[in-house]
Amino acid sequence: MPVITLPDGSQRSFDHPVTVYDVAADIGPGLAKAALGGKIEGRLVDSSYPLEKDTKLTIITERDMDGLEIIRHSCAHLLAQAVKALYPEAQVTIGPVIEDGFYYDFAYPKGFTPEDLEAIEAKMRELVEQDLSVHRELKSREEAVSLFRRMGEEYKAEIIASIPSEEEISLYRQGDFVDLCRGPHVPSTARLKAFKLTKVAGAYWRGDANNEMLQRIYGTAWPDKKALKAYLHRLEEAEKRDHRRIGADLDLFSIQEEAGGGLVFWHPMGARIRRVIEDFWQERHTAAGYEMLYTPHIAHEELWQTSGHTDFYRESMYQPMEDDHQLYQLKPMNCPFHVLIYQGRLRSYRELPIRWAELGTVYRHEMSGALHGLMRVRGFTQDDAHIFCREEQIENEILGILDLTLEMLAAFGFDRYEIDLSTRPEKSVGPEAIWEQATQALRSALDKKGLDYAVDEGGGAFYGPKIDIKIEDAIGRKWQCSTVQLDFNLPERFAMEYVAEDGARHRPIMIHRAVLGSLERFFGVLIEHYEGKFPPWLAPVQVVVMSITDRQEGYARQVEEAMRNKGFRSLLDLRNEKIGFKIREHILRRIPYLLVIGDREVANQTVAVRTRYSQDLGAMSLDAFMEHLSVDVARLGHNISEED
């Protein structure tokens, strides 16, 4: 009979088969009431899951991240049940958990309105009050297909046909609603009390623009109403900070329908910021011992066959183009190009480590439904770098990468982050000894830097372990930007070599790394982090000079010219408008400093200084203000605020 081992090492013995719920009840009534499910050998299961043999068990409650996933998964089914109750002609398709919530796609040609969402949410709450038990059922493939076809759910029948034959078919039933799902789910609808439907959007079936357009209803769910309220507040903040709206308001960038989705046009103000970022990036990389590269945008398809991209990355690549009976491929990554430069001649151990960096434009095939402003695009510039080194040099190179990465992120105002170390997966390439040495080098570098990190056992790529850094923005969202990835695969595929001290030839270790990731995506994160109020060193216009009347035009021109000659990004506003109107307009443009020139300033050869927060800093000499601005611009990572 089963002996159940709990996370603290304690054990519970039973003389008959039990469920996860039974174990929780044996521990105590409080845990039984809180239990949402269990975790066995890394797999989430329902609270009704039978335990017939000795096993290790973790009881999952709403306090666990896994519990939150169960809640959200169950809310997706609750949403589908409510839609079917109100709109029986709608067909259900898929409803997964996503970050901070869930969605469900419906085939419903009429489309859902905001009023429909209110009615659906009200129905969901009604179903919660009914306290419907949730049960798992196993069906044969034929039974499941027959059931859903009788219900008129053709999409579900299609999904079942795509499930591997060795997988069991499980359904979940609550009340008169049944859905196809692996689970797990909460034991009762009464456990779902803190949720909100947020929006409706279009989505193609299976993400393919050639398929039917579906209606996607998004929602969020949390353990309690307090957490839900906090999230909805963050959501309001996120909407205010939406980079697409701010980008249009400040004329930073656009995506033109005539050119196609996911292709970014940088406007003059956005291009200024990009140039500042690129110059800073190149300066810091040069100081860290990197050499800059430029590589082509296309290459023979054979190159991508050698690198393995056509085998492992084909779905993210565009179709090849033909010229003179030769197929060419747009590059999805820069790595093979850097390898070709390395292969240009035989390398000596004395040359290693080699550090090469490139702001290289790459192209990824993305479904139109997945595109999102600057955050998900088809053509973007990667801040790529590759290091070729010996095994014993790995740790020092990782230390250097971490120094450079954290310094650069701090300069952009990001000093809070999460770090993950991902280790060898079950399927991998390369000798076990090198994997162990490389993983230990990554771990040791993180430890020497005193950085907190989580270990994702088995989460590395098949070709090497990696470090991922997620930055946290002003409203607490996490963004994956920086990556350090060891690669034992490409050196083998390209037969890369260097001549060692003893004259023998060896494979170099290859390290891929990105600090910012995609420039486009990082710019989108910056816009939302600062709400368009960029720090002075990044602002496209750092100071605007405004005259009150045309009597001050000559002096205003002198002031603006002096600013420009000092290297500041300045703007001159001599329009025949009221000064209050000008000030309000430039505050809306988020310009850090506003200089007002009136008769008094002309007479005293001063400037009246204001900030974009309407703070009046008083009159200053031009030299004093330029010194003030110089100090501000030099303070990387600092931004002026309402308190300054």
Swiss-Prot record:
The protein's location, in the record's own words, is: Cytoplasm
Chemical reaction(s) catalysed: tRNA(Thr) + L-threonine + ATP = L-threonyl-tRNA(Thr) + AMP + diphosphate + H(+)
* Domain called TGS: residue spans: 1-61
* UniProt KW Nucleotide-binding keyword: yes
Please list the residues that bind Zn(2+): 335, 386, 512
A single BP term in Gene Ontology: threonyl-tRNA aminoacylation
What EC class does the entry list?
Answer: ligase
| Principal place of residence | cytoplasm
Q: Which cofactor does it need?
A: Zn(2+)
Q: Where is this region: Catalytic?
A: 242-535
Which SUPFAM superfamilies does UniProt cross-reference here?
Class II aaRS ABD-related, Class II aaRS and biotin synthetases, TGS-like, ThrRS/AlaRS common domain
Q: What family is reported?
A: Belongs to the class-II aminoacyl-tRNA synthetase family.
Subunit annotation: Homodimer.
Q: What is this protein called?
A: Threonine--tRNA ligase
| Organism from which the protein derives | Nitrosococcus oceani (strain ATCC 19707 / BCRC 17464 / JCM 30415 / NCIMB 11848 / C-107)
